[in-house]
C-alpha cells in the first residue's frame, strides 16, 4: 500500500487495523500476508491486487475509519501454493505471523514480519523452478560501462562482470535471466530492463563504493579484493555490494552459503548477443517456450542440478579448448557406461540447493532425508567411475567424495519418515538420544494408561457410557450420558454440559495430562536442540558438499551428452586453433528430431580463402535452417558435446552474430528495416575475423535498388574489414556477382523442382546460383486463390520481358 493510502488519522481505526497499517508502512511495495488464526489475510490495495492476480474472492472486513475494508485471504496450510504462484508473477511478499497475546482485555495479538519472499531471494524448494537458476542481479553504470552482479541464493553462487556496452549488458541479462533486478535511481538505461517482471529502483547510497568494499571484505573475511580480481574494478564492486546488502536484508540473516565470488571474464566464452540467442532458439524458442529448442533436444539429464548446469553451458559455449577437449574426451569415455550411471544418478537429489539451505540453516527434515539417500548411492557410483580411464572423470570422482561421517550421522539421527517441519516433532530417530526416548515413551504409554484408567473407573462406578476423551481446548475429560449423572462421585468436577452428555474432570486425570503435555513440550524443545546440533556437526563438511554437488552436476551433464551422442548419431568434433569451419554431412540438431522423413545432410567449408558464402534459393528451401545448424553445431562443440555431422572441424570462434528476421520484436516502435539496420550496424562494429556471422536476406524493407546497394556494401565490409566467417542468404541475384569481384566469396544455392504452380524443395546445397526464387510457387502453398496466382504469373512474365 502506498503511503498516500495509509490513513492520516489512526484514532478512528480498530486496534487490529492500526497494527496492520503500521506493519504495512514498513513494506509498502510488498504484499503483506497478515496472520489471522488459520488464515493469512490481506487488506485494502493488497487484497484487491491478490484477488486480481490469483482469481480469489474479494470480500470485506467490516469497516474502519468509516470505510469498507477490502479483504482477501488464503489458508495458512495452503500458503506455499499461493506464494509460489505470486513469486512466478514477480511479486514480493512479507509474511507477518502471530506471536502472543499482549493485551488481556482487548486480546490484541502481537504480530511481526518473520519472513520476506522476493522472486530473486527464495530458497524454499516449493518456490523454485527445479531446472532453472534463480538469479537476482544488480547493475551499476558509469562512463557508459556497466558493473553487473548476479547471485543465486538457492545455490550459493555469486558472480560479477564488467560490461562495455548496453548491447552486451542486454546479452548478459538474457543469458543469466534474473528473476529480480536492482538498479540505481539515476540509471539512464531503464528501457533495457523495463519489460522484465521484477525491477527495483534503489538509493544511490546502496551502491556506495566504500560501503560496498567493506561489505564484500566482511563477507569473505578478507582485507582486499585482489584475490577475486576486482580490487580496482569499482563498477563491479558497487553492483556486488548493493546486491549483497539487499539479499542480506531480505533474508534477515548472514549469508554463510556465499563462499566464493566469481569474476566472469566475458572473453572466456563465445559471445552471443540477445538477437543471436533468440534467433538460434538455444533454451527458448521465438515464443518464449522451451519446446523445439536445442536444450529440449540435448537436455535429457536425470538430475535437476545437471539440467541447470547444461543450460548454463549452452548459454556460454567456451573458447578454452583445453576444457572443451577434456569434456569431449569424457563424453567418449562414458559411452560404455552411460546406462548404469544414469540409473544411479536418477537417485541423486538436488544436493546443490540442499547445501545452500544447510548453510542458511533453513534445511527441512526432508532435505536431510534426500541428502541421506543421495550419500547412500555414492559408493556404487564410485565403483563404476573407477572403471573409466579418463583423467577428467577421475578428477570428478575425487570431487564427489564419500561423506561416510555425514551419512552415519544422518542414519542415526534422522527418522526414516520424519515430519515435514521440526516444529511438528517426530524428526529425530529413536535411540539417538536417551532423554528424548524417555520423554516420548510417556506420550506413547499415555494411551495405555488412559485406557486402563477408563476401564477401572467404568467398572468401579458401573457406568456404561463412561468414556475418556481429549481435545486441544479442554484437554483430557470424562464424558458421561446425562442419564447416569446420579452415579457421579462428588470429587468429579463438571466442566461442560451438552445436550445429552456432561463432561467432567478429576485431579488424577489433570495431573497425568500435565505430565503428558509437559513431556511433549520438553520432547519438542529437546528435538529442536538436537536438530540444531546436526547443523553444527555438518557445518565443517559444507564446502566439500558444495564441491560434490558441482561434480555430480557435471557428471550428469557429461553422461547425458554421451547418451545423446549415441542415441542421435553424433560425431566427436575436432577443435582447432586455426581459422575456419569444416562440416561434412551436417544436420540441424532440432529439426531432424521432428521430421518424419530423413534429414537432408549438407556440408560447409569456411576458411581464410573462402570467408563468405552467399546462398540463393526459394523461401522454405532450407537456407535459414542451413545457416542456423552451422551456428548450433559450433555451440554444441563449444560446450563439450558431440555434433550432428559425419566430420566436424571447428576453428577458434570468438563471437556468433545472427540477423534473421523471424526474431524481430517490433514492440519498441522500430520498423523491421530499422531493426535490421541497427543489428547489421552492431555486427559491423563488433565482428572480428574469428566471428561467425549469419545474415538472412539483408536489405529487405526498402526499395530494391537501395536494399541491394546496402547489402552489397555491408557484404564488402564484412569481407575486407571484419574478415569474418559469413553466411549470407539473399534474393538479390545481383549480389552473387561479388564472387567475381571478391576472391573470398563463394556462391551456393538451394534448388527446387517446379511443376505448374506447385513446387518440391530439394533441401540440398549446391555450388552456383539459383536462377529463380520461386516466390509465386511458394505463395501457392499458403492457400492464395488460383486467380491471384495466375495473375501474378502473367505479371511476372510481363516484367521479365520488359
From Swiss-Prot:
Keywords of this entry: ATP-binding, DNA damage, DNA repair, DNA-binding, Nucleotide-binding
One Gene Ontology molecular-function label: ATP-dependent DNA damage sensor activity
Organism: Buchnera aphidicola subsp. Acyrthosiphon pisum (strain APS) (Acyrthosiphon pisum symbiotic bacterium)
Superkingdom of the organism of origin: Bacteria
Positions that bind ATP: 617-624
Role noted for this protein: This protein is involved in the repair of mismatches in DNA. It is possible that it carries out the mismatch recognition step. This protein has a weak ATPase activity.
Protein family (similarity comment): Belongs to the DNA mismatch repair MutS family.
PROSITE patterns: DNA_MISMATCH_REPAIR_2 (PS00486)
Entry annotated with the keyword DNA repair: yes
Gene Ontology cellular component terms for the protein in this record: cytosol
Name of the featured protein: DNA mismatch repair protein MutS
GO BP terms, alphabetized: mismatch repair
Lineage of producing organism: Bacteria, Pseudomonadati, Pseudomonadota, Gammaproteobacteria, Enterobacterales
